[in-house]
Amino acid sequence: MLEHHVNHALVTLLSDFGDRDVYVAVMKGVIAQVNPKLQVVDLMHQVPAQDIAVARFCLMNAYPYFPQGTVHLGVVDPGVGSQRKAIAVKFAGGFLVGPDNGIFSGVLAQNPAITSVELTNSQYWRTSQPSKTFHGRDIFAPVAAHLASGVSIQQLGQEIDPRSLVKLNVKQCNQTKTGVAGCIQYIDHFGNLVSNIPESYVQAKKWCVQISGVMIPGCETYSDVPFGDAIALVGSHGWVEIAVNGGNAHLQMHINFYDQLEVLFLHKNQNALA
């Protein structure tokens, strides 16, 4: 274990590894081998397998709540072992470590990269001959631990132009003649259907959502509709979402990731169900 100057920095973990296998625990073990005093926080490990867009969304919505200098480790890596770069990025709020596949593009759209490097210095890897299928263990976890322990980002490898980093081509909402068209970009544990339409589009407006031929009223709280009814509202992360009061919108409405929807703007006296 190398000597470091920082003992109590924070590392977050995000992956599509789930909780059935040992992969997450193995990465935590590698981090502890580098520096057992580091704090490790699980963001989530239930990202749908190989779904970089969902990983991007989750990290983008989580990172603002962590202290300055936090190292965010993201491993949703369908291209593991290929020519895709392994990277570390410094931005205003901390650091990002993982594959260069667009997983960090949501964060970097809000906070541009200050410094980015390709992880070419194997001194900071677990082994100089990493597995072709588990860079999370052999490259990303140890690099994140060293970075959180005070190693400068420049020591980790060759500096690269931040403009060269992969930007994920995610679906954007767009204005229509009657409102805003978008899609479902995330489904949470409660079955709430989170769209890619930000709160700013519906502020100070009367609105509803149309999806799969169903009109759903836009409200402020779950209790604004009867128990068991569908509702559209702005969720805690600032996106228009669809829920069922006391129920599971995903299961009850049979709506899935990337299904299309439209926010419709209503006249002051117009009913959403009219």
Short names for language-model regions:
Residues V34-K37, V54, P67-G69, G74-V75, ...:
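Active-site histidine-anchored catalytic micro-motif
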Residues V22, V26, N35, Q50, ...:
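Conserved active-site and cofactor/substrate-binding residues in soluble primary-metabolism enzymes
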Residues A9-T12, L38-V41, T70-L73, A86-A88, ...:
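Structural motif
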Residues V194-H254:
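A conserved acidic, glycine/proline-rich C-terminal tail/linker
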Residues N248-A274:
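Pepsin/retropepsin-fold aspartyl endopeptidases
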Residues M1-Q83:
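N-terminal glycine-/serine-/threonine-rich phosphate-binding loop
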Residues T127-N196, Y201:
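Anionic-ligand-binding alpha/beta catalytic cores of soluble enzymes and soluble regulatory domains
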